[in-house]
Regions:
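Intrinsically disordered, low-complexity linker/loop segments enriched in Gly/Pro
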Residues: 1-46
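C-terminal functional regions that serve as terminal interaction/effector modules
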Residues: 39-42, 53-201
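Short Gly/aromatic-enriched secondary-structure transition segments
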Residues: 48-51
Length: 201
């Protein structure tokens, strides 16, 4: 698994304190079913048969039990919530990205002058670039991602949806707005606009 449980626990604690922690379970009998936890701006999903004892222990620690298939609830209210997944993808083609960014290898994050973490993923015909919250980026084990033969799918979605890191086993979502909907003073917007030729498809 590519999730650092100690870092994830830190995010879960903050979300619980803020009253935004959600824990749920997809139908684990299905191919991509599994368990998930989420805060107000992030979500982590792990496929059912790949969930480690440590990950399940975190769920039990915060909820007192393992949720049943199809069950989703907020820790602070116990009320059923609607699904939080699904969005339209958009990409930043590699030919529009500055040479300095193109040189960054898969799975690398760098601190920008604006204080955000810039994550980069290189595909054969396109380069995906996005700014993420450092606390969330720390949850991902980029070393394991880069060493794994089965390169994870990493994509960027818009409309207050998610940036997803992952593959069939697990992924982490970082919630953010589409660049066109961001306030002018939004750090993530400034990071994206600083990359020459940023285009949304």
């Amino acid at each position: 698994m590519y999730i650092k449980n100690a870092k994830l626990e830190k995010l879960m604690k903050a979300a619980k304190k803020a009253g935004t922690l959600v824990i749920g379970c997809d139908d684990i009998s299905k191919n991509y079913g599994g368990y998930y936890v989420a805060g107000s701006f992030w979500a982590c999903h792990v496929k059912g048969d790949e969930a480690t004892p440590e990950f399940l222990a975190l769920i039990v620690k915060f909820s007192g039990r393992i949720p049943a298939a199809g069950e989703e609830y907020t820790i602070h209210t116990g009320m059923k919530e609607t699904a939080i997944y699904g969005a339209r993808d958009f990409y930043l083609p590699g030919r529009f990205v500055k040479a300095t960014v193109e040189a960054i290898k898969t799975g690398v994050t760098v601190e920008t002058e604006l204080g955000a973490t810039l994550a980069v993923y290189q595909e054969p015909k396109r380069l995906l670039v996005y700014a993420v919250n450092k606390d969330v980026a720390d949850v991902i084990d980029f070393k394991q991602l880069s060493e794994n033969e089965d390169t994870p799918e990493i994509h960027l979605t818009n409309g207050d949806k998610a940036i997803c890191y992952g593959n069939e086993t697990c992924y982490l979502e970082v919630w953010r707005m589409d660049i066109n909907d961001m306030p002018e003073d939004c750090p993530a917007k400034k990071v994206l606009e600083a990359i020459e030729g940023t285009q949304v498809f």
